Amino acid sequence: MKSITGALRAAIGQRAKERPAIEPLPKSRRIDGKVCLVTGANSGLGKAVAIDLAERGGRVLMACRSGHPEAGEDVRRRSGSDAVQMLKVDLADLASVHRLCDELRTTTPRIDIAVLNAGLMPRQASQSKQGFELMFAVHFLANRVLVGRLLEDGLLRPADAGSEAPRIVLVSSETHRGAEPIDFDHLGAFVNYSFKDGLKHYGQSKLTQCTFAQELSRQLNPAGETRVAVHALCPGPINSNIAREAPLLLKPVLAPIMKAFFLSPAKAALPVTYLCCSDAAGERTGLYLHMMREKAPAPEASDPQNGAKLWSASEALLRPHAPGTS
């Protein structure tokens, strides 16, 4: 209960201190014809991002576990765009991620913008299909596989002279700052915990995710240029479905607090849209935004040694689960 109360207090404090330093993009900013992949786009923040990108002229691919086909129909209706398609993926199953990538390879010429948004905080400890801690698997490992395949299959193409850099935007969280250091000796290992410890493990998964974002930026832009723009952000506290796993007794308490003090998904989508569509974000890499303000991520996430260690350790974790291995 203490962790939940602390999280609510922090979220309300974030709203009270909110002073945007970056202006939201005007609706006149267009991305006509750009292919945009958005994970977790069936509700909440992901759905708001999908609507915004579709309104701006993007061809939006909504990669979701559920919400088929009604979420896609709603995005089409609210954006006024028919260039919206739903794709099936379960990010808790690496085989499902590979199936999505196989489908994209045969149906999609390229990905210009990838928004890795899907997230969750389960009521109690859960395992992914391959036996990893669930939040580690969804927030980091699935994204590691997805990005790797998009690059390997030639859908995410690093820019050369005269071409525009594709963008990868990871939706993370300020909870990464208070997380314990990454345990490389037990990376991704399932541990049993209850809901009251969920926020702690959520923060650990987000530290891993932020570390990945910084290392991915270094790996793809080794000479300091921007061939692929890789960014991460915390959108702030959102009135969305991420608290759907809260105990039933808490839901009547949480609902009015979230409605009063948390951001609507549409407002929380503003920094995501900025990183996806602005000229400035396309010319740089490695940005981290907290709502509409640029900040440095936690030192642990920015540390190149941590990044390199995570890269090699996760590569070893994934090897037994590559397609064609038993």
Residue positions per predicted region:
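Generic recognition of well-ordered alpha-helical segments
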Residues: 215, 271-274, 313
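Mobile gating loops/cap/lid regions near enzyme active sites that modulate substrate access
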Residues: 246-248
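C-terminal tail/cap regions
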Residues: 2-20, 250-251, 280-326
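Juxtamembrane interface at the ends
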Residues: 185, 251-255
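C-terminal helical subdomain
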Residues: 97, 205, 232, 256-297, ...
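Short interface patches used for recognition in eukaryotic signaling and trafficking proteins
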Residues: 58-60, 85, 255, 295-299
